[in-house]
């Protein structure tokens, strides 16, 4: 009997060893996240540098998109697109620009103050908890390290990386965009929040992941990654602009081309990843020429169309000195666990179809896309089916360029609700705020009966008296 027990235990142990060696264990899955970064170190100027397991290093820049939502300023969209093109040109070969726009549904919380009057306090209490969408924008500058068996420290490349970081910040400052590099503590928290997909709460925790073909489970929530372009059947319009027109009261108004990502039903958090890879231009032009010759050698309608398209791209590059870049765009949509993911899927497909973009329906590598969308880890994206070649100007049109309406920095604040229904402070004089719009204080209030003229004038008079404005 003892011999049988010993043989049974031995067979059980051998089976467990074979099972672990073949199928792995939970620790093997955990390494997917543990080995994302070797470390996060702080350099001069309190700039955090993230070192990935592949040897790439990166820094995260927090900015504010310059275009105000519903501003109807077409030039502003083009100016920001051109500014990002300048950043890409400055970075050059071997770098990647990873822009992340984080959209979070929050409940409105009024500013705490002990000096408010009863009516003002009641006004803000009325809007307390009203849901609205907040947008935060981060840009990660990534330098690729040549992959090999051993990664060696290159002082020249490291120095070039630090110089490029300063140049990018200067370019943004010249374009009127305030920016700040995250320090070690801020970068660590940002990476953790990306992993937890939680940006609304001050305190958060990480949970387990359950990856499937169409979504990833995260405890009481789940998320789905939508890739904007399917490289096997690219569905993009022939002509793309940084904005699109919508109809409002029988009049057209320009909005951001990617404005649909802010209106996904049921989503609590959305991260729009926009990645631009900068390749060797000569190498890519030679590959294009080779591809054109290959298509020309087999004359049929589809090949002739391909030859014409390549010729047009070559002409644009030669005449206008444009750049070839590789792009990847995806949206991480996080919803409560009981949400039917077909609803946001249908909304995105319908919205993008209206502007001529057919999003990919074959994103089966959900966990791979999620992990490779972490800041600094973008070079792990598969070169064959996660990146597509295009001109830099076209890629910049797919960037998100807007920010939500914010309260003006002014001592003279008159509150009105924005299009989301939450209060924002407006300086109606245009001369008291940090941003001066005029030096003329003369104005009049015009409106039909019951539109709030008396309330507006009372608010203006009271604020003017409180702040001693003239």
PLM-predicted stretches and their roles:
Residues 3-401:
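Extended, folded cores of ATP/NTP-driven motor/assembly subunits in large transport
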Residues 73-77, 81-89, 101, 410-470:
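Glycine-rich phosphate-binding loop of nucleotide-binding enzymes
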Residues 389-399, 404-423:
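Pre-P-loop entry segment of helicase/translocase ATPase cores
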